[in-house]
Amino acid sequence: MSNETNCTLDFEQSVELFKEYNLFITAFLLFLTIILQYGYATRSKFIYILKMIVLWCFWPLNIAVGVISCIYPPNTGGLVAAIILTVFACLSFVGYWIQSIRLFKRCRSWWSFNPESNAVGSILLTNGQQCNFAIESVPMVLSPIIKNGVLYCEGQWLAKCEPDHLPKDIFVCTPDRRNIYRMVQKYIGDQSGNKKRFATFVYAKQSVDTGELESVATGGSSLYT
């Protein structure tokens, strides 16, 4: 007689288990839905940060589940598949950290560890403020605006400033490149003639190099002074 215990659940046990934990499952799925649907930097920074934390947790969770699958494979084919998937998850996770650290060394912004993209925009205002923002890709044109004394770029709130605080050049950094954008057009004022209420600027991609933001100087001052 075998002493092994059958740990599989039949249909009735599965139904009872679901009934017991359905409230937790509902709350968890609702949490994920809200995070994934409303987690954008242009909507709510708080929810967006929660979304980033959830995405960060997925990779270690995938690796842990993959290791468990390797330890307790259903059969030989399942073991091979589990090993392949676990190795892929580990390589992807390591690759993410390598690229994020390279980007952080280039722009010194915590947005470098954003799992949704590998690019960070940087604006050094002439008053000494440094504004970094998440950006999904490297565009050909950037159009920051100032509305009621607040600077926005890519729909994200950055800082309070005046129109004359915008620099001649702004940057978008990737792990291996620094993209330089030069101001080609600006409009300051509105129909009421109040120049402090609204201003829009157009920056076109000017050049690409491999420098870091630390090498940029504006008016003789380092970016980080």
Swiss-Prot record:
Q: What is its main location?
A: virion
Q: Which InterPro entries match?
A: GAMMA_CORONA_M (IPR042550), M_CoV (IPR002574)
* Matches recorded under Pfam families: CoV_M
Subcellular compartments: Virion membrane; Host Golgi apparatus membrane
Q: Which GO terms describe its cellular component?
A: host cell Golgi membrane; membrane; viral envelope; virion membrane
Query: Which is one GO molecular function term here?
Result: structural constituent of virion
Q: Which of UniProt's keywords are assigned here?
A: Glycoprotein, Host Golgi apparatus, Host membrane, Membrane, Transmembrane, Transmembrane helix, Viral envelope protein, Viral matrix protein, Virion
- Virion surface topology: which positions? 1-20, 73-77
CDD domains in the cross-refs: gammaCoV_M
Membrane-crossing ranges are: 21-41, 52-72, 78-98
Q: How does it sit in the membrane?
A: Multi-pass membrane protein
| Superkingdom of origin organism | Viruses
Q: Which residues lie on this side of the membrane: Intravirion?
A: 42-51, 99-225
Q: What's its job?
A: Component of the viral envelope that plays a central role in virus morphogenesis and assembly via its interactions with other viral proteins.
Q: Which family does it belong to?
A: Belongs to the gammacoronaviruses M protein family.
Q: How does it assemble?
A: Homomultimer. Interacts with envelope E protein in the budding compartment of the host cell, which is located between endoplasmic reticulum and the Golgi complex. Forms a complex with HE and S proteins. Interacts with nucleocapsid N protein. This interaction probably participates in RNA packaging into the virus.
Q: By what name is this protein known?
A: Membrane protein
Q: Which organism was this protein described from?
A: Avian infectious bronchitis virus (strain D1466)
Highest classification ranks of the organism: Viruses, Riboviria, Orthornavirae, Pisuviricota, Pisoniviricetes
